[in-house]
Amino acid sequence: MKFYRDHTWPSTLEEAIVIQEKLRDQVITEDQLEEPIQYVAGVDMGFEADGTISRAAVAVLSFPDLQVIETSLAHRPTTFPYVPGFLSFREIPAVLDALEKIQTTPNIILCDGQGIAHPRRLGIASHLGLLIDMPTIGVAKSRLVGKYEELAETKGSSQPLIYNGETVGVVLRSRTGVKPLYISSGHRISLPTAIDYVLRCTPKYRLPETTRIADKLASAK
């Protein structure tokens, strides 16, 4: 997969904040999809050697039948510390390496992390989507910002995730009786469409098949 890689990576949190505040207004939260949707991908991260080596995994699946088409794995030295709200600077360099290895270009990428449900509206899904100019969805296992009402236990139940008076995502029950996921637009996709594709990618488990398979790859020893 080819894309234009041009980005300055910060060395301090102050520099990272400047980049996030500069990029946040470029995020598109309306549908700009290339249809028909034939391929969906998941990206996830793991770390080796006490966090000094980043390991990024990409899994590309056919859609809607969710069969694995291609996977890739990339390693590189970790150059940014672990700080909540700034994980994209720690993780994206290796993710870009992994994406460059795949031959099949996905129509949508589901990221293990936040989209605009972020203090500066630029979680890893939004940041990555901007860098490669592709539709991305934030699929997080935990909440970073916002409040929400309790939701029903059945699959498909959801509640708006509200932050500073604005809906930045939804809390979505992807499987009956399990903990919910935190879904937000990444880039070039609306929230309703993001919810639809997350549910269509979760036929059996809590996580979408895309990120579930990428998580297994990234977590492998």
Swiss-Prot record:
GO terms for molecular function: deoxyribonuclease V activity; magnesium ion binding; RNA endonuclease activity, producing 5'-phosphomonoesters; single-stranded RNA binding. Its EC number is 3.1.21.7. It comes from the Bacteria. It is found in: Cytoplasm. Keywords: Cytoplasm, DNA damage, DNA repair, Endonuclease, Hydrolase, Magnesium, Metal-binding, Nuclease. InterPro entries: Endonuclease-V. Mg(2+) binds at D44, D112. Its main location: cytoplasm. GO terms for cellular component: cytoplasm. Its cofactor is Mg(2+). GO terms for biological process: DNA repair. The record marks Y82 as: Interaction with target DNA. It catalyses: Endonucleolytic cleavage at apurinic or apyrimidinic sites to products with a 5'-phosphate. Belongs to the endonuclease V family. NCBIfam families: PRK11617.1. DNA repair enzyme involved in the repair of deaminated bases. Selectively cleaves double-stranded DNA at the second phosphodiester bond 3' to a deoxyinosine leaving behind the intact lesion on the nicked DNA. HAMAP family: Endonuclease_5 (MF_00801). This is Endonuclease V. It comes from Nostoc punctiforme (strain ATCC 29133 / PCC 73102).
